[in-house]
Amino acid sequence: MADLKITLIKSIVHREPRQREIAKSLGLGRVHSSVVRPDNAATRGIIFKIAHLVSVEEVNK
């Protein structure tokens, strides 16, 4: 099973509070910061809510 590399490409400043909370819950604080998370339904659901702020790529283990 693959992992997902999630990179914040747009700032969370002046975004709705819920979008900021979601980005911080993923561990994304600054623009161009990246995290690796497992590819599952929960992670995909979180990404869907802030898809306009992040870039996602699949990474093999």
Swiss-Prot record:
GO terms for molecular function: structural constituent of ribosome. GO terms for cellular component: cytosolic large ribosomal subunit. Gene3D superfamilies: Ribosomal protein L30, ferredoxin-like fold domain. Keywords: Ribonucleoprotein, Ribosomal protein. GO terms for biological process: translation. It comes from the Bacteria. Coiled coil: none annotated. It holds the Pfam family Ribosomal_L30. Belongs to the universal ribosomal protein uL30 family. Part of the 50S ribosomal subunit. NCBIfam families: rpmD_bact. This is Large ribosomal subunit protein uL30. It comes from Oenococcus oeni (strain ATCC BAA-331 / PSU-1). The gene is rpmD.
